Amino acid sequence: MNRLAVELPGLSLKNPIMPASGCFGFGREYARFYDLSVLGAIMIKATTKEPRFGNPTPRVAETPGGMLNAIGLQNPGLDKVLEEELPWLEQFDVPIIANIAGSTVEEYVEVAEAISKAPNVHALELNISCPNVKKGGIAFGTVPDVAAELTRLVKEVAAVPVYVNVSPNVTDIVAMAKAIEQAGADGLTMINTLVGMRIDVKTGRPILANGTGGLSGPAVKPIAIRMIYEVSQAVSIPIIGMGGIQTAEDVLEFFYAGASAVAVGTANFVDPFVCPTIIADLPALLDDLGIGHISECIGRSWKTGAHAVHCRA
């Protein structure tokens, strides 16, 4: 028995570990270090209809507990992804989750319809939570009705299950998640980055050319866990959790909160081997805790009832 295997809509995962979109490109750089087939899945970089060159530099800044980025959805565009990147990934025994973005509803729908037909794309991740673009992205992800309508329209044309990336930059993430579920989403991915800023004390100006950027890394982990803990009790669709994961112990925290799989983001920049290391470490951790299968951990923190909370301070 594979103790790490996970079944999600459209995804039969050999293990629940995958690199998060935007932190792994299309896998080419990391394939020089290890066989990508060891991964549970790969969330490829966000794809838009036309190529995007992203925001001006500097667009990355370190913080004490992570990093800020304002990349701006830089990508080669739909045609190149379909003609070059996805065919290259076919050599690996790993399902692909295609992250899609756009400036308009029509762009999202067009990209979703086309990319979901690729033979190795098993699911879509609808990016409505990127805080670093002037059009699209988070503009679709902060109003429940807008997010729900976009989800519904993408579901109508997608040939594979649709997961929606939920923004933490909202007043009520539970209301947002429920609206997306009711619109037909097959799953959620959460959380994306939190909007932040750093200022250069010598110039008095923001370090990032964009001014603000998305905060990721260990600093956001407690926020991600709290949000997943709340949302997982309010919806019935699975959650792929992300936000500051670096170790096998982190993975179990996310599972206990209610995630059914996880994505590792910023840690890939620190250690390119972080994903295979976590995969290798998980069985021993399960042994130490007397857990037979990783699925036994899902929602353990609130299913016991001892610590369930349903309100915010």
Curated annotation (Swiss-Prot):
CC terms in the record's Gene Ontology section: cytoplasm
Locations listed in the record: Cytoplasm
PANTHER family hit by this protein: DIHYDROOROTATE DEHYDROGENASE (FUMARATE), DIHYDROOROTATE DEHYDROGENASE (QUINONE), MITOCHONDRIAL-RELATED
InterPro entries: Aldolase_TIM, DHO_dehydrogenase, DHOD_1B, Dihydroorotate_DH_1, Dihydroorotate_DH_1_2, Dihydroorotate_DH_cat, Dihydroorotate_DH_CS, Dihydroorotate_DH_I
Underlying gene: pyrD
MF GO annotations: dihydroorotate dehydrogenase (NAD+) activity
Protein name (database record): Dihydroorotate dehydrogenase B (NAD(+)), catalytic subunit
HAMAP family documented for this protein: DHO_dh_type1
Protein family (similarity comment): Belongs to the dihydroorotate dehydrogenase family. Type 1 subfamily.
Residues at which substrate binds: 45, 69-73, 127, 192-193
Subunit: Heterotetramer of 2 PyrK and 2 PyrD type B subunits.
EC number: 1.3.1.14
